[in-house]
Regions:
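Binuclear metal-dependent hydrolase catalytic cores
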Residues: 1-143
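Cap/insert and terminal regions of metallo-dependent hydrolase folds
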Residues: 133, 142-144, 150-204
Length: 204
């Protein structure tokens, strides 16, 4: 299971001796470039490494459009056609045909191993770009993952009593104030102090 697919994810997985083809599902918290830019490499590498099934991709509204315009007939059309020329790659085309689940707050994904719930967080106004935080539960343990967000009640709920909270902490408060004054990132991100307050409220 993979949460977001930013720069270097695929390379780091390979370095850790984890095959991208072994990842059951990918959850994209939102569709900003720094959270999805490695996704094409992740999918194509899985294809090249003989993945047989379609990767499950869970994300906000727009995820299906994003995936549909990447490979066959999309931005990576030339790459796809070159690799698909080989008979072996013709046999596992499912690997570059993701199964997309666009989620709403609540239960986003469940299989025999994991349960993933999500809720909207406060990064960008929702009518522009949906952004999700998630709670991942497996083997009696829970992990909360914020994606990008300002402090918000939804993330506190997702993180409540979790075994691990992975929360963004991008800028100090002085820079968050500066961004607000310049009209950039009025909602956006969480400072170190604010993250401490979220953790206390969530009892993690």
């Amino acid at each position: 299971y993979l949460f977001d697919c930013g720069a270097g994810i695929t390379r780091n997985m390979v370095r850790a001796n984890v095959s991208p083809g072994d990842v059951t599902a990918v959850f994209l918290t939102h569709l900003h470039h720094d959270h999805i830019c490695d996704f094409p490499l992740f999918v194509i590498t899985g294809w090249m490494w003989d993945r047989e099934d379609s990767p499950v991709v869970i994300g906000p509204r727009g995820t299906a459009h994003f995936c549909r315009n990447l490979f066959e007939g999309g931005a990576f059309k030339a790459d796809f056609e070159a690799r698909a020329h080989y008979p072996r790659r013709q046999q596992n085309l499912a690997a570059v045909r993701p199964k997309v689940l666009e989620c709403e707050p609540g239960l986003a994904y469940q299989d025999e191993h994991v349960t993933i719930r999500c809720d909207w967080v406060e990064h960008i106004p929702r009518q522009i770009s949906e952004c999700f935080g998630i709670r991942f539960e497996a083997e009696g343990k829970s992990v909360a993952f914020s994606g990008d967000t300002a402090p918000c009640d939804a993330m506190v709920r997702l993180a409540q009593d979790a075994d691990l909270l992975i929360h963004e902490c991008t800028f100090p408060e002085s820079f968050i104030r500066h961004r607000a004054k310049t009209g950039v990132g009025i909602y956006s991100h969480t400072s170190p102090r604010q993250l401490g307050e979220v953790a206390v409220r969530a009892n993690v």
